[in-house]
Amino acid sequence: MTSRTAYLAAPLVMVLLLPVVGLFVSPSAADIVAGAKHPLFAPALWLSLQTSVLSLGLIVVMGAPLAWWLANSSSASARVVELVVNLPIVIPPAVIGVGLLEVFGRRGLLGPWLESVGLSVPFSSAAVVIAQVVVAAPFFVQAGANAFRKIDDDLMVVARTLGESGPGAFLRVALPIALPGLIAGASIAWARALGEFGATLLFAGNMTGETQTMPLAIYTALESDVRAAVVMSMLLAAVGVLLLVALRFAPMAWKWTRDLGGLS
């Protein structure tokens, strides 16, 4: 990188970095302790962990087969499905929240039927999970499809020739090769679910202990106690930074582990 290019890039790098630096530099130790004791902190943290882990589990279970199919199909329908999967990336989360209300709300597409069997989805913990799945799933599916596309087809053919069934070849050949990409996609999807705000607010509401996740608690705390909002923001930022660092070094660790396994 030339000095001129560095000067041009520096302002953008600073704009991206300063908000994160500000979170960790501005508050004092007393502010952090006081913020962590705020009544919104613990319930929001626990709910966020519960819902985001459940969302991630659903995304992985449903998304891995979809990613495999997208990677191995060249049909027009696969390309259409891939476009649909990526829609939540480009559609604003608030719009997704309104759309979910139009599907699951009392007057929505499924609302009357759900109400007839005694189910109400909006403004519940289930709505939090649904919102997180919708906004986060594309990141896992896309990463998984890219990982599966890198697998040499000849390896699968050899596995089948040696007597492996289709599922067996997938589990013993394809999955280990694609695992680093799947883990990276799952990490990004989990971080996205953990930080989801707009769709959750509109579809699930902002009820303490029931639908108020960490981002919503930050929004609420800003009106009464900025210290609590800063502490919760620090926690989410720290999770993001740690995930990025882990993803940066995960490929090297994976290669090192496989090399050790080959030597043993």
Where are these regions (language model features)?
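Membrane-water interface segments at the C-terminal ends of transmembrane alpha-helices
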Residues: M1-A30, P39-R149, V173, I177-G198, ...
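Short coil/turn motifs that cap or connect alpha-helices
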Residues: A76, E164-G166
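Short glycine/proline-centered loop/turn elements that form peptide/ligand docking sites
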Residues: I151-L155, L260
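The alpha-helix within a helix-turn-helix
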Residues: A159
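Glycine/proline-centered hinge or cleavage motifs at structural transition points of membrane proteins
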Residues: L162-E164, P176
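Short hydrophobic, aromatic-rich alpha-helical segments embedded in or entering the lipid bilayer
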Residues: M207-A221
